[in-house]
């Protein structure tokens, strides 16, 4: 991997919610509040305040600006005698006391099981309960909707609050806790909701921590036969981890304050810049990574495997909480895609590519927005290698690697573990490691100095792109064989323990597996930061070096592969405890460090010069904590290392003529797609009482963009009888409803004046429901409520235009009647992104009782007919493809001006690269229109409609011999072609 994070893209590193920079607010893509400056009002107030009266300003989604009062941390509020106590504090302390009394009075035989269940309950309340609440709040602002619907924060004197006792209790509770700069009546609903949510979080977090400590006490003991030295080591190490954990929590709270500690930005945003130092420079997501070191310290002091396993389970649950709840919200709130740069394009000067455009054109830079520049370059390939989802057995790289791995695994499993076989497997692993570091290092060193690898392919008329692809295959094969041979050698040297409870056997396996998992995570983080370009040392092959960025794991470490990237080999050492594996681990680590110092580092210095960072975040944090004498010692050690490395480089340079050799290898790589099949939940709910509602008063009518003419005429395919080939006679004035793929559909509805405010309309496939009276399948999010503020989510209101407009209409029996009417638009994620026949269903009172069903309508993508284009000119065909493709791409991108292009040259919005659903929609449409199947990565790589049209034209040319259409391939000669 090529040094620090090298990438053509711009990266914003998003920390965990408990540790992220609260940046100035900007608008988000969904129209909600996002971090940007909070307006002139905040600035004026800020100018007027003195340094001693600094205030923090918050902003709600509707734009309300308010002063955020200072709050105290949870532990101080609960345990400090100087802090005023209210009813909720007493309740939390009482629950904690019950836990302690339970430990005291439970019989010793049942304490462990009881407190294991209690701790798992509170951990589930944290990760599942709080996680669900935050997920719903992030996506639909559910908690705020609950508060507004119940009117619990509205003054009872207005007559709108049906819960005056609850109102007074909350007012007393919150104003007692926040005596300064806070008024319960004047605070926004979002802020009050957050304060109530905080009290729930306080209860769960305190009980979670208390039950864990009590569970540790119940499990604690001293192993039989343990000596004093081991006892002292256990307790010293355990206490050190606990103290480190305590420092992490305190330092994290010092940086992020209560706002981020209690997930405040799920409710509102603040105008404040936080300085990230200390623990946030040491590790990613420190609250969830190193912030759980105390769990393992307590497990070590308790000497209990039960406690250790539950600690690992709780830690894993916390990471799941981070991935499923916090990270999506962080990405949506703080890492919204930047506005698209639009460049005026002189279309008169943009010439279409010729039919025989060179296959060796340069790769398009993703950051180039000039339509003219992009239009004249051939789109690049996006056939990635790494990852199980990229395995493609049609590629010789992937198929060869897979076959070799199968053969290698068979040899390792089927051969006996005799000393002779063990020797050959260890020797094989050592040779592959030497090749991976020395051989690959030599190639990269020569490539850096004289472009040796590229020159070889140019000599035979190949391009730089071909050299790059061949190199990727060589490196990928070498890497997979290196680790496969190491795993095989480890397997040969490993023997299953006869007694897992003997000594440290089980602990060694747990620590070894943890180190292996750490290496896998490190490799995934490196790949996420570098991409394929950096992973395969792309800056050794392309002079137009990308911008140097430090994102992801490189924010904390300059060379993570130096230590963490080899944690797995030392995990294997712990598991096997054999000298041979120790030798392989030492060899691997030594050669890796030599590779970094002798190959990567000189090239990075030559390429990036002074822009290279000397110290990473972790090193800076450690240096700040060192005394001056140790800092001087560190500097002298660095000088010695630099002098030694310089001597080795000079020695190798002098000996190079004697070591000359050619290096050749095979080509192999990985890519295939695993598809997820969404499960459907069938829900049957029948409204018990529909009396008083006449279904004749309900109706649904549709408006949408009619599909293209080719789609209308495709029903007559020539396979029918003669009568069926003509257009059908339609009786009545209603035309067939056939809408464009992905186009918004407007739904107009009517209902009785007294209809339920919780009525809703859903979109379904016609074949999904056999009953017209009740819907028996979930809408999977494709529904909209007929009235605002009727459901506990704002998502169901997206697309709602109007509600309860009284109109006079004639019913089917001819009787005029006043009814309520409304309009809504289904678009984006509320549509089906496939072809078929669909219908809308009007449902009663939040249930699944059907009151009205719309006319069935069809979504169809018309086939592109290039036979209709006069002649066989490439330019005409491509122009026609561009014209047909542009509206389809716009529909696939939800017609969002920040994403969808307005012209064929305009670049797609950056959100297309982040969310794969957009590119998957496009490749489906292209497959249906042109019969050509692309991978979603191709759409992202092309970047605009013109490049995609070029790729379609090129694919049609390549596949022309297999087509029987006149323009696409050879056909049977006709009389006019003969003679």
UniProtKB/Swiss-Prot annotation:
Keyword line: Endoplasmic reticulum, Lipid biosynthesis, Lipid metabolism, Membrane, Methyltransferase, Phospholipid biosynthesis, Phospholipid metabolism, S-adenosyl-L-methionine, Transferase, Transmembrane, Transmembrane helix
Pathway: Phospholipid metabolism; phosphatidylcholine biosynthesis
PROSITE patterns documented for this protein: SAM_CHO2 (PS51598)
EC number: 2.1.1.17
Location in the cell: Endoplasmic reticulum membrane
Residues exposed to the Cytoplasmic side: 108-113, 221-227, 303-304, 419-422, 495-499, 587-979
Lumenal side: 1-86, 135-199, 249-281, 326-398, 446-474, 521-565
Pfam family, one: PEMT
Disulfide bonds listed in the record: none
InterPro entries membership: Phopholipid_MeTrfase, Phosphatid-EA_MeTrfase_fun
GO biological process: methylation; phosphatidylcholine biosynthetic process
Job description of the protein: Catalyzes the first step of the methylation pathway of phosphatidylcholine biosynthesis, the SAM-dependent methylation of phosphatidylethanolamine (PE) to phosphatidylmonomethylethanolamine (PMME).
Listed name of the protein: Phosphatidylethanolamine N-methyltransferase
